[in-house]
């Protein structure tokens, strides 16, 4: 008799579970440490805790927890659109940027297609690609950063998505806007370029750029940001 798990696609069964940043409570329990002596740096978390304005906003929002929230995020999209100078209908919300990355993969990848990303890429890229049954085309890094010329050579007729983290996670390397724009101009229009800017706010002032304005120039560009 066939096992229930054998009925799922082979590419799903081959996925190794994603290992998120270990909670401090787990480290304390496993190693018998004082929680006040443990410093966690792995998950981009604020060690200072919630600010007073955030606490007040949460308390106010708690008054409406008996109701489902607006599934389309109308108010949040309106404020984000005003902040970034785009239209609300250009914004997609997710449960963290991981959710947006996975939605992009599910929307554009399937068996017989492929996604291109760097040798040192965010762990979610290969997982999201494999979860759709697509092939991962991994481009060797140059000095721990993205080789955009290598990306262009790797793109073929079956490439549907290119993932680029800038600044890159986990290497911390950065591509200036001139290189990104030159790359975008050469990417075929059938390929979705996902520009993952989860660490955008960490850039030096002289390195900062506004990629949200590029989406009007490149219809195949998706810019991902994160509140974390």
Locate the predicted segments by residue.
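Glycine/Thr-rich phosphate-binding loops of Rossmann-like dinucleotide-binding domains
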Residues: 49-51, 101-104, 125-126, 171-172, ...
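Active-site pre-lysine segment of PLP-dependent enzymes
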Residues: 148-158, 170-193, 197-228
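PLP-dependent aminotransferase-like
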Residues: 107-164
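Short acidic capping loops at alpha-helix termini that bridge into adjacent secondary structure
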Residues: 36-37, 87-91, 111-114, 158, ...
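Short glycine-rich anion-binding loops that position phosphate/pyrophosphate groups of nucleotides
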Residues: 44-46, 97-98, 122, 166-170, ...
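N-terminal small-domain helix-loop-helix segment of the aminotransferase-like
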Residues: 2-96, 103
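Short, structured coil segments at secondary-structure junctions
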Residues: 87, 132-133, 217-218
């Amino acid at each position: 008799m066939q096992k229930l798990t054998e009925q799922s696609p082979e590419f799903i069964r081959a996925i190794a579970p994603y290992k998120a940043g270990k909670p401090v409570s787990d480290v304390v329990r496993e190693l018998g440490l004082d929680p006040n002596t443990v410093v966690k740096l792995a998950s981009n978390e604020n060690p200072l805790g919630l600010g007073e304005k955030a606490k007040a906003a949460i308390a106010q929002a708690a008054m409406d927890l008996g109701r489902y929230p607006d599934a389309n995020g109308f108010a949040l999209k309106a404020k984000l659109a005003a902040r970034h100078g785009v239209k609300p209908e250009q914004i997609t919300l997710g449960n963290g940027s991981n959710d947006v990355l996975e939605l992009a993969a599910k929307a554009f990848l399937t068996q017989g297609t492929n996604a291109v990303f760097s040798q040192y890429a965010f762990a979610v890229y290969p997982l999201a690609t494999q979860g759709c049954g697509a092939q991962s085309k991994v481009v060797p890094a140059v000095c721990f950063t993205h080789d955009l010329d290598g990306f262009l050579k790797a793109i073929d007729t079956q490439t549907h998505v290119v993932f680029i983290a800038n600044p890159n996670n986990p290497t911390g390397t950065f591509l200036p806007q001139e290189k990104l724009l030159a790359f975008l101009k050469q990417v075929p229009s059938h390929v979705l370029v996902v520009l993952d800017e989860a660490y955008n706010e960490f850039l030096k002032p002289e390195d900062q750029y506004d990629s949200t304005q590029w989406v009007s120039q490149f219809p195949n560009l998706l810019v991902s940001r994160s509140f974390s």
